[in-house]
Amino acid sequence: GTAKADPMTVSSWGDLIQYLAWSFPLVGAMMILTWRLSNVMIDGAPVISGWPLYAVYGVLTLVYVAHVAKTLEINVPILKAGVPEEDKYHWGSVAALNSTYFANFGAELAVVSMLPMFFENTFSQLQSSEGNYIMTATLSGVIAASFAFVNLLARPLGGLLSDTMKNRKRTMLTYMVGIAFGFLGMASIGQYGEVVDGQQMIVPMFDGTLWLVIAVVITILCSMFVQGAEGATFAVIPMIKKDMTGQIAGMAGAYGNVGAGVYLVIYSLVDAKTFFYIIAAGAALSFVYCFFALEEPSDAFAEEMF
């Protein structure tokens, strides 16, 4: 029998091209991280350079080439013979869910790692009526933890809504819109202040502790959409092709890590406000892709349909 580590089987030549194209970022994200490390200096020397750098690029390229070869070896005979109608599935839906998990779980991993510093820096000058500084490293950590803690409620809710709204595609699209607006809200927490030592400072959009409370509420609402979308993504995956659920889930899950890697590299190059705008744009692009590529699963609610 075929091992589950084998590449996916696809239904058409067009799907094969899509699969190979969507497989590259799984390796490409590692290349981007390697490139970023080659630009990080410690004691005046890059973390990785010269032949070790090119060796990593070479190994990653070989991994992708081997994947392409194996994919063609498995799929070309099947496609030449013709795929039976009952075995066909819509690969565009797999690609669409890769994009949603990139934009939701990828964003979550990236944001959780930068959120404590964002709150600590943005609200560093906020003082209580007694003149004490309110924002401490501990408080900023608690606020950031609330973003992740919402997961306990939000992710199951995303799956539940996908089950109850009777249209899994519409649920997914609604969540992606919510993420886009959520991160636009996050971007509005701070505004550009002065430049200190060549670094762009971000200060609160409004003064006072009330704005800090509102900022925390914006953060939690954004997190509700981000993590609900993760639940909604995995509510669709088993509906695409039942006997390939593991492989489809594995690829979508990997795209979450690709998203985190790409977003964190971007974060190392831009300020926090721009970073939130970029994540919002990522969710908007995923929405557009899903709108055109994601098919409502035909038997998603079989008992109602037949």
Predicted regions and their residues:
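Intracellular juxtamembrane helix-capping segments at the cytosolic ends
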Residues: V226-K241
